[in-house]
Amino acid sequence: MTNYRVESSSGRAARKMRLALMGPAFIAAIGYIDPGNFATNIQAGASFGYQLLWVVVWANLMAMLIQILSAKLGIATGKNLAEQIRDHYPRPFVWFYWVQAEIIAMATDLAEFIGAAIGFKLILGVSLLQGAVLTGIATFLILMLQRRGQKPLEKVIGGLLLFVAAAYIVELIFSQPNLAQLGKGMVIPSLPTSEAVFLAAGVLGATIMPHVIYLHSSLTQHLHGGSRQQRYSATKWDVAIAMTIAGFVNLAMMATAAAAFHFSGHTGVADLDEAYLTLQPLLSHAAATVFGLSLVAAGLSSTVVGTLAGQVVMQGFIRFHIPLWVRRTVTMLPSFIVILMGLDPTRILVMSQVLLSFGIALALVPLLIFTSDSKLMGDLVNSKRVKQTGWVIVVLVVALNIWLLVGTALGL
């Protein structure tokens, strides 16, 4: 009886610690459902129905492993990826890494900020510029939570992630997808045309986000409580739950687009405004409103995460710190310039995703090198199987993103 009580007490303590350590992966997972994912998944679903759902499944599994490695680096070393690169590589190399990471963080923020502004425009009927002003105000308010520590921000970001997931449960109910075809699309790989290959590369490029790789290692580097192995075990649960939710949202986005657009003959739906306007007569005004709200929630939360990632990148690479509100102000400027110049926001959004693809391998390669170093990682070093899987992901991501870049350059 005494042994049972001890085991029960230790079990409760383990669960309590696991819950206390949950949160960082929910911040990271927001990067996987930003407006870039909305645009890519909608286009893929409208064009090819359920045939590219398997790409979302595999991209999400890859992303899970990458985020676990990033989180593990922070737990094992007490330093984030940017700091490790700074400590192990020559200064010119570090400065190059910092510049490209900042450019990629700003490109990411551009897509996320404009995505949220489009969401406000759609649901409130305001101009894109007014939507951008509302986005700026909202992100400043959310970032103010950082003054109270990481936990309040984790709760808000996690809440927004769950809201987007709930919104897409509603969208699935409205669109009523064919479950048998949906399941087949998730399991059986299919690339029927060269455009499908191009869109598959786009889905992968929009899913694995370099700025989140840097950020996640910083979110776990100061975790306390329990042993390193216990913190790592709790983090794996954190990543599994958060990334499963993000994966569901991406699947639901594509499945909704397939059911609502592809099978009703609207295969050319390619941008967010068009998707919103097309949803109204096909499903209902309520479905279109839910879509707009989910776009706002995803855009706001992901642009906040992008700001935090930019801060980590600057602090880690060059040991320089600026207040978050200053960084937020500076990174908003390109979005306002794009809007004031009257450029096509969806095209800018897609171009930013292409730019992002340059940074994926640059973040992945050092992450794999560091997490495979037994002197650095100790008992948390990568196993042989994880190393091999990691390098396969690197090769695949680089190959598909080269395809994406070449296809974009040639106008394929």
Curated annotation (Swiss-Prot):
GO molecular function: cadmium ion transmembrane transporter activity; manganese ion transmembrane transporter activity; metal ion binding; symporter activity
Periplasmic-facing ranges: 40-51, 119-125, 176-196, 259-276, 345-350, 407-412
Membrane association type: Multi-pass membrane protein
Biological-process GO terms, alphabetical: iron ion transmembrane transport
Keyword terms of this UniProt record: Cell inner membrane, Cell membrane, Ion transport, Membrane, Symport, Transmembrane, Transmembrane helix, Transport
Matching Pfam families: Nramp (PF01566)
Superkingdom of the source species: Bacteria
Major site of localization recorded for this protein: membrane
Keyword Transport: yes
InterPro entries, A to Z: NRAMP_fam
Transmembrane segments: 20-39, 52-71, 96-118, 126-145, 156-175, 197-220, 239-258, 277-297, 328-344, 351-370, 388-406
Similarity comment: family membership: Belongs to the NRAMP family.
UniProt-recorded name of the protein: Divalent metal cation transporter MntH
Gene: mntH
